[in-house]
């Protein structure tokens, strides 16, 4: 039996105020089957929009994971997105509605085999 494998990044995204859609860098998740992303707004303002984990088989055509959307990231709030990985590539996507001045959003992730 193979041991469970993990890959973590505590500094995947560190962004200031959101003023447009924001896409994280592509993560090659080929050997993994589950992903969790922790999205934290450490400031007091609330950027409004939806956050998603996106999936792709070819690193070109992306779809939003069903059920991964979370609305506004309130000041001081932590959101956890968790999903089974059925594609080779994954990334974070922020679908902008309106910005929260001085918001400081960070994203970390954990992949699990």
Regions from the language model: what does each represent?
Residues 8-11, 65-74:
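Solvent-exposed serine/threonine-rich low-complexity stretches and specific carbohydrate-binding patches
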Residues 46-61, 106-108:
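Short, surface-exposed beta-strand/strand-loop-strand elements in extracellular ectodomains
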Residues 41, 55-57, 111-113:
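Residue-level signal for short segments within beta-strands and strand-turn junctions
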Residues 26-39, 45-48, 108:
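Aromatic, loop-rich ligand-recognition surfaces of beta-strand-rich domains
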Residues 1-22, 26-28, 95-113:
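C-terminal interaction-tip segments
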Residues 24-26, 77-84:
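Exposed aromatic-hydrophobic patches
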Residues 41-49, 97-102:
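Extended, low-complexity, turn-rich repeat/linker tracts enriched in Gly/Pro/Ser/Thr and Asp/Glu
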Residues 33-37, 84-103:
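Noncatalytic modules at the cell exterior or secretory-pathway interfaces
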């Amino acid at each position: 039996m193979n041991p469970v494998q993990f890959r973590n990044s505590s500094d995947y995204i560190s962004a200031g105020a959101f003023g447009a859609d924001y896409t994280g860098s592509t993560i090659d998740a080929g050997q993994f089957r589950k992903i969790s992303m922790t999205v934290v707004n450490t400031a007091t303002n609330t950027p409004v929009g939806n956050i998603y984990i996106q999936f792709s088989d070819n690193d070109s055509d992306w779809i939003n994971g069903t059920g991964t959307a979370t609305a506004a990231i309130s000041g001081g709030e932590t959101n956890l997105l968790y999903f089974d990985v059925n594609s080779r590539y994954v990334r974070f996507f922020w679908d902008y509605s309106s910005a929260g001045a001085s918001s400081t959003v960070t994203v970390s992730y954990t992949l699990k085999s």
